[in-house]
Amino acid sequence: MGIGATAGVAAVGGLALNAQASGEGAGSGGSSSSEALVFDQDGYSTLTTTITDADGADHEVTYHFYKAITYVARPVDEKYQSLNISVPVTIDGKAVDATDAPILFANSVGGYMPSSVADATGVGGGGMAGGRGGAGGASASAAPSASAPSGGTESGSAGQVSGGKMVSLPRLGLAAGYVVVEPGARGRTLKDAAGAYYGTAPAVIVDLKAAVRYLRANKGRVPGNVDRIFSTGTSAGGAVSALLGASGDSPLYDEYLKEIGAADAGDAIFATGAWCPITDLEHADGAYEWCWGTNALSTGEQADQTVSKQLRSQFAEYQAGLKLRGLNGFGPLTARNYDEYMLKQYLQPAASTYLGGLSDSARETYLAAHTFITWDGKNATFTWADFLTHVGARKKDAPAFDLFAFPTDSSDTMAGDINNEFGTGTTQYRHFTPYSLRKDKGAGARLAGDVPEKLRLMNPMYHLVDKPNAGRSKHWWIRLGSSDSDTSLTVSANLAAAAHRLGDEVSHLYYWDQGHGANTDAGDFVAWIARTAGHRAQ
């Protein structure tokens, strides 16, 4: 039974919340996990919707909609610790048996903000609470245009775009015959009556793991194949999707999961989809300066180049320590050769694909406007310096993530977002790197004692590089716009290289001229799910 539900039919209307953010929830009495976390197979509404697929074709889909199911026995805040499930019944009038269909597990986290499905009235209705973006919206064709698109969403958005239109993976997945699960999760801005933050790290990943455990504990009751869970997310949601995949069944989270009454089941997932993941946070400042350090700000001014140089040096040391090798036999990845790797492995192929998809006249127009590109009729080539000039202004100042000085306007929820993610108690912002901490507080300052553990809990690279996790996802779909300066282009590339080194299947590419939140091959991802899961469409 979930919030707003009655026996037999989930209430799509109003919502009776039982938020226990004052601290009464965790560790309090109540139903045992086994009693509270049994999926009610009859608790659905039957809905019908028209979904436009990635090729532009419309499909009438009738589905069972299970609304706002609380997935833990001792919730801190049910508004966020609940999930929706959508199960296809008929597609274009043809009956669908989704008993063993893949499960698309689509989070709508953005900016590490809270996300809720409590007010959703159907599939794709989840979204950030009090923030921008969401998982909803119509799908769009991925056909390229002649102009240089800068398509994308705002920083902190969980939305995806293609051709200027919103993309909804939950809706596309449902139209493909998959079971769609949309989990809510706590986020960094949530405060109780005493002003204490209860959604900061590691709450978001703990909640997503608890949602997976709920599904696995209800194997045979929940429709769909719980051994074929495909996680998706964008921006911070892409980061936690990658983290969910990398950290499957890790014992590091057990204490947190026990505290909220998570089901006694595993939390490993089969495959991970991550779009523009804002991750590897403790190393993101250095990576950002390596990538975008010489690009001017939108004001035309340069970021502090002394700071930028110091952070680039940190990145070089970090990158060398990873001991990663590039895909396709490139060899060791270092700060010295990463530009060459980005060009050969990702950026030039991305430009080639884009140009190859244009009509002859559109291609001629584009190349005339972008003379830095050499085109031989099949392949595009250019230099790293010219690519940086093409992208233009960097989106963030230096340092990009762990700010030297915290914001004074607490109403701006995106300023100091990562410092807020590592806040605790009534402290809104905290440093999470020694470099920024010491710039702010002095050379002798030390990180708070709990921060290193929380960094490990929030970083997929820990589970792929530092302590390779046997329970991780073995299938990865990673995407990023080439013009996305919300984080460094190396972040996704390192994630892909780390998973590839462990023998995992990795599909990773960049969308040419696209910004933050781009998803121009959503149809390919939907097909990849079926192929990877071994699922045959009915």
Question: What residue spans do the PLM features occupy?
Answer:
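N-terminal export signals
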Residues: 2-18
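Primarily recognizes the serine-hydrolase "nucleophile elbow" in alpha/beta-hydrolase
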Residues: 217-292
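Alpha/beta-hydrolase active-site loop
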Residues: 198-220
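C-terminal catalytic histidine-bearing segment of alpha/beta-hydrolase fold enzymes
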Residues: 284-288, 329-376, 381-383, 477-484, ...
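Mobile cap/lid helix-loop segments that gate and shape the active-site cleft of serine hydrolases
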Residues: 75-81, 161-162, 247-258, 265-266, ...
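Catalytic-loop region of hydrolases
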Residues: 21-100
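Short beta-strand element of the alpha/beta-hydrolase
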Residues: 98-112
